[in-house]
Amino acid sequence: MKKIFFLMALLLCSVASYAGKQAVYLYGFAASFNDSIVYFTDLQTMAQAEIDRHNFLYGREEYSNQLRDYLAAQGYSHATCVTVWATSRAALEKKYQRMRSRYLMLANRRTKKNGAAPYTIKYLTPEEFSYTPVVAEKGTSTK
């Protein structure tokens, strides 16, 4: 019984200490069913992003909304946007390469079959688009 109590206390302490602000790496992806253009942002570093105790990026939907709003302002409306993040750059680069290669492979396969490229992949540089940190509201706790 004491061992179980000790393990539970240790687990709670480690989870509580993990929550808070830390550096995260993220990139964005956008696609639309109405268009054949697919957008990828560069990998970006967010120095003071908030991570809650369940290991989720606080305001993760707001990061996707930032990309959606930027693309809508550029005339690319109705985009479905996804923001992928990780706490290590190597893990994020692996996710980025996997998603990017999947779209390149599909585009090459369909180009050979039909003679026309089904996707146009565009890359957004940090000068064109960069994420801004989402700050936790006063009443909301990330811990």
Where do the model's predicted regions map?
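Boundary at the C-terminal end of the N-terminal hydrophobic targeting segment
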Residues: 17-19
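Sec-dependent N-terminal signal peptides
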Residues: 3-15
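Generic structural motif
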Residues: 4, 32-34, 89, 126
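Short linear sequence elements within intrinsically disordered, low-complexity coil regions
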Residues: 11, 32, 44-45, 68, ...
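Surface-exposed, polar helix/loop patches in the mature regions of secreted/periplasmic/lumenal proteins
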Residues: 78-143
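Short aromatic-glycine-(Arg/Gly/Cys) micro-motifs in beta-strand/loop hairpins
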Residues: 21-80
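Alpha-helical interaction segments
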Residues: 8, 53, 119-121
